[in-house]
């Protein structure tokens, strides 16, 4: 049975850590203290603290653009900042490239498409915006404004290899979006949770489309699209399973690893890892209670590093904890 071992606890922020993202050896963090910090995952040392005057309120979400040293950060001040680095050796400074405006209320989540062509943002104003980015990450043109959620949109995530976007909302649903005839349209509405859906993540698989979601109702659910076609419109989605009950309070973040494991964290301070032991049947293979002592955990992300299976969590204690999943 695997166990989760705490590798490092980094006290990076003076207020809750909302978001983490990892790319090209750099871990980015965003916090209620308005700060964005960059950490070298090879030694877990702080590389840089970005200019905290860029945002007037909390930084709720950070996301690296694929294949380049560009970071997007969404804030409660309604804006999204874009930052760029010129080097891979972490010696240079990160510069502010652009500030994106458009949302009327707090930006809750930002996410890049797998090819880096699109940046999606969502907000308490109930909308999801899709932006086309130029190669330099300095110009952003609004491609679509999606307004079909009836409440606050909490989180967005792109599929790892398809132009599919999932948005999670206070209206208790997940919506799946895809491009059709040069417009972005809602391809499916996933209903079944009994409370706010805080998060979701797509399976990283070459065939089939599955999504996990976490909710205020304390459950993590798996959804499956009954097609493997590129065209997902007019295709049925089913709730494939509900993962074994672990959480006693809201599930704030889920992450689906490249080798098929799912991690979840939430308001109860629990970090859990699940494995599919046969098609549609999952087991809890590792669990840590009070993973950030008495504090809530807001985010979890998988990190593959030198053959090690690591997890990164961020909590209300301002800490970023790094965990290793080890076979005992």
From Swiss-Prot:
Going by the UniProt record, its keywords in alphabetical order are:
Cytoplasm, Nucleus, Repeat, WD repeat
InterPro entries, alphabetized: CIAO1/Cia1, G-protein_beta_WD-40_rep, WD40/YVTN_repeat-like_dom_sf, WD40_repeat_CS, WD40_repeat_dom_sf, WD40_rpt
Where is the protein situated, by its record's location annotation? Cytoplasm; Nucleus
Q: Which SUPFAM superfamilies match?
A: WD40 repeat-like
Q: Does the keyword Cell division apply?
A: no
The subunit structure is: Interacts with NAR1.
Q: What does this protein do?
A: Essential component of the cytosolic iron-sulfur (Fe/S) protein assembly machinery. Required for the maturation of extramitochondrial Fe/S proteins.
What's the protein name?
A: Probable cytosolic iron-sulfur protein assembly protein 1
